[in-house]
Design a protein with these regions (language model features):
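Active-site-proximal flexible loops/turns
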Residues: 30-32, 122-124, 148
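Generic recognition of short, well-ordered alpha-helical segments
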Residues: 71, 98, 124, 149-153
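Internal catalytic-core helix/loop-beta-alpha segment
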Residues: 88-131
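A short glycine-rich beta-strand->turn/loop micro-motif centered on a GG-aromatic cluster
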Residues: 112-115, 134-148
Length: 188
């Protein structure tokens, strides 16, 4: 049987993956309408804690935190103590040279994105990553947006652009690789 989708990348591992959190900010969170805020925050924090437990490089950004959208949500800051957030003004996080440099400095070729909003903050840099030769994944349950149409069309656009859409837990469990690992309880 021949697969209908020839895009079947090599598995994510602790040596090839990094996580990029884009604009998980207080002001943007208040407009989320496609997901329960409590569940969305749970998924964002779970992704952050799993990334830390697996020793994955993490890049975090905010946009216009002083003028438009406020700081990163406190729950994400607490899950990533000591993490610096790159505050920028560009719509596409990748267009800020500091963000691009931070992503490239991870040395990883598989990038997991989570952001508010899904169709802009997570999607734009993920699509750019694909164009730049990276494999990009969007953890759709760690992303939110402002209505269901934006969510549905955003996921379609991501898939059409070569970005893999999947849930955060599946990504981190794939990276974990072995339930006998002492890191397993922190990942699950």
């Amino acid at each position: 049987i021949m697969p209908t989708n020839s895009h079947n990348p090599e598995p994510l591992t602790t040596s090839n993956a990094a996580v990029v959190f884009v604009d998980n900010q207080v002001g943007l969170m208040t407009g989320i309408r496609d997901y329960s805020i409590a569940e969305l925050k749970h998924n964002i924090v779970g992704l952050a804690k799993a990334a830390r437990a697996l020793d994955l490089p993490v890049v975090t950004t905010t946009t216009s935190s002083e003028t438009l959208w406020g700081p990163a949500i406190p729950e994400l800051q607490a899950a990533l103590p000591g993490q610096s957030f790159i505050d920028r003004t560009t719509v596409n996080a990748w267009d800020d040279p500091r963000v691009e440099a931070a992503i490239r400095a991870t040395g990883r070729n598989k990038l997991v994105f989570a952001g508010l909003s899904l169709e802009v903050c997570a999607a734009f840099p993920a699509m750019r990553a694909v164009r730049e030769g990276f494999e990009a994944y969007v953890a759709v349950d760690a992303c939110g947006t402002f209505d269901m149409t934006k969510r549905e069309t955003g996921i379609v656009r991501l898939n059409q652009s070569g970005v893999v859409t999947v849930d955060a837990s599946s990504l981190m469990i794939e990276i974990l690789g072995d339930n006998a690992s002492p890191k397993a309880p922190e990942v699950y």
